[in-house]
């Protein structure tokens, strides 16, 4: 059941303030956050991380961003908006892809997010599906290039990832089923990988397993156990890795568990780089964010102890963060 937009708006203040309190001074949103939120944060009406947003994620009909049930024809949904979520929009064919991407930029998007393959939570696709035709992806990339920014793609399989990055996509979200050749290609093309391992762990737990139906749970299990292996491959092939979580709504509070999970694969320094320097570079902010240096924006955390010695302290922000500084202001 979709959350009413009015309820989502009521929860935004808490979500933003809680993320900042956990130490996240910048957050990249890959579907749903609108431009007005960035403006309110900049103006000080809301306390929260600065936002880097894509607006809505763009999906093909029947793709990961299409929330319509497969039990009814598309015409059954024409007279209502009950099937529209806050996360995605649907576009088919090159003209619609041009228009959808330009509309997101018109509304203040910083980059474009597409659904390049099947997903766990979507009702009518398989994870193995490759989504969008080549000319559609190329159209979306061309629009992003004209705005001097990038396209990132939701994709799990090696086939979907390779298809996207060969057409100019510069970011891959999730990537749980990539193989060595795919990782090599990502490294060669300078493509960024953002694993979201905590999502599958939380959704697979007894506490939240009821959120997914039987088929969606099966898909979640499939990607859960292969995500760590994919990260090992990406690390070995020197793919640029960013920190991510992909948690929605009340689950967002679990985002710091990603630090603990990544400790199984990455060194503490590599994990910290994935949450600071590398994503700043990905988003064209490498000369402003991610480091404590003269001329950089004054974002920093004051900790009780050194996360380089124990990365898991970042998963316990309430007891380990003394204060969060964003743009020189202490929160």
Swiss-Prot record:
GO MF annotation list: hydrolase activity, acting on carbon-nitrogen (but not peptide) bonds
Protein known as: Uncharacterized protein YJL213W
Residues annotated as signal peptide: none
Cross-referenced Gene3D superfamilies: Metal-dependent hydrolases, Urease, subunit C, domain 1
Native species: Saccharomyces cerevisiae (strain ATCC 204508 / S288c) (Baker's yeast)
InterPro entries associated with the record: Amidohydro-rel, Metal-dep_hydrolase_composite, Metal_Hydrolase, Metallo-dep_Hydrolase
Family: Belongs to the metallo-dependent hydrolases superfamily.
Chain ranges passing through the membrane: none
Lineage: superkingdom: Eukaryota
